């Protein structure tokens, strides 16, 4: 049950149950390749009535429920009893990124420490090295420049989508190509900037989607 919400609710809907097996396989492959497994939590509740209202106890509840989903997925998916097990438990998660990068940092850090987490990836910063705040490593998304604009955009594909296409996931082919080109140049410039200065890790958020003809994933792959 999400904090302050009815049991079984989500702010972004639910995937097709037939996708659960595919996602288990994808997580298994990611783990086998050495990728970090972190939490983005459960219902993705943003805005005035979402995670901004949550207390530390609410975040602890959300983390406990996330752990339960990871560790007891067979219980909630009886049709997958014969599916190969995940090669990890919820205890491998040592941090997370909150929905929409929202929430009270103090409440979040308190809950993270109780959960044994060591990092938070929910803030936005500059092209900088991670730093320790409140006993946790803060690993922020980074503000980077988009070609032809004076504003800096958080290094996440969704933020680029809002800036470049008003949040719409569809566009004409020529618009898609321009978005891909501009995004690639933004990513490349940010990489060049850190390589020629403080050599901080460059963090580029990507939902592995096909928004605007796959422009963001294509730019990242390039």
Range-by-range predicted roles:
Residues 3-17, 82-198:
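Active-site-adjacent pocket scaffolds in enzyme catalytic domains
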Residues 48-52, 152:
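Short acidic, glycine/proline-rich loop/turn micro-motifs
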Residues 1-38, 43-48, 56, 65-104, ...:
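Active-site beta->alpha N-cap acidic-glycine motif
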């Amino acid at each position: 049950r999400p904090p302050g919400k009815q049991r079984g609710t989500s702010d972004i809907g639910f995937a097709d149950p037939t996708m659960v097996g595919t996602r288990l396989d994808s997580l298994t492959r990611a783990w086998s390749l050495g990728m970090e497994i972190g939490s983005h939590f459960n219902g993705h509740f943003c805005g005035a009535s979402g995670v901004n209202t949550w207390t530390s106890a609410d975040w602890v509840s959300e983390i406990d429920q996330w752990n339960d989903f990871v560790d007891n997925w067979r219980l909630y998916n009886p049709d997958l009893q014969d599916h190969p097990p995940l090669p990890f438990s919820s205890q491998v998660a040592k941090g997370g990124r909150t929905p929409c990068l929202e929430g009270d940092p103090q409440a979040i850090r308190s809950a993270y420490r109780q959960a044994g987490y060591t990092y938070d990836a929910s803030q936005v910063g500059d092209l900088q090295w991670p730093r320790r705040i409140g006993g946790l490593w803060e690993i922020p998304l980074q503000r980077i420049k988009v070609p032809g604009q004076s504003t800096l955009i958080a290094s996440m594909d969704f933020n680029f989508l809002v800036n470049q296409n008003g949040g719409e996931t569809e566009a004409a082919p020529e618009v898609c190509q321009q978005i891909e080109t501009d995004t690639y140049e933004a990513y490349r410039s940010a990489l060049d900037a850190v390589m020629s200065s403080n050599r901080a890790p460059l963090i580029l958020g990507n939902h592995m989607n096909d928004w605007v003809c796959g422009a963001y994933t294509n730019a990242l792959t390039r």
